[in-house]
Amino acid sequence: PGIVFVAGREESALRILREARRQGVQAIFLGGDGWQGIVSDTAAANGAYVGTSFNAAGRKPAVQRFTKAFQDKYQTKPDAFAALAYDATRLVAEAIAQKGRSRSGVREHLASLTPAEPFQGVTGPIHFNASGDPIGMGFHVAQVVDGSLVSGGGNSRSRPTVIAAASEHR
């Protein structure tokens, strides 16, 4: 196969990648945000592509401030899960500040967000559709290159940027 997409989390993805490598499968492997920690096994994961909703190497000032504060406190770069938790916490805090502590007030604030006036999170601008699903957050595809998640992939003509390194996921 040319491309193999594996839906799943880190543990199952690594089992599949290891077995595929053992059997000599020559394919591009692609996974979602549950794959972020696969960089810890550089032999199995090298060359795989990982979808993520956050790029710690992003250029926006809010992303840089969040990444620096996170690194200063935890001595590692934040991953998408940390960024999503940060955005969710800030979003609820903003809703409470605007509409009070009631569930209906928080819901009202979240429903008031629009594409023209979204919540500006570190994962991107966020608003919600009529069903309450988040819309507008960013999505990045990174490639595992020598134990790091690299934005743009290792074969990009632009200079690749390290998003997270293997040592940060152990």
Question: What does each model-identified segment do?
Answer:
Residues 1-170:
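Extracytosolic ligand-binding ectodomains
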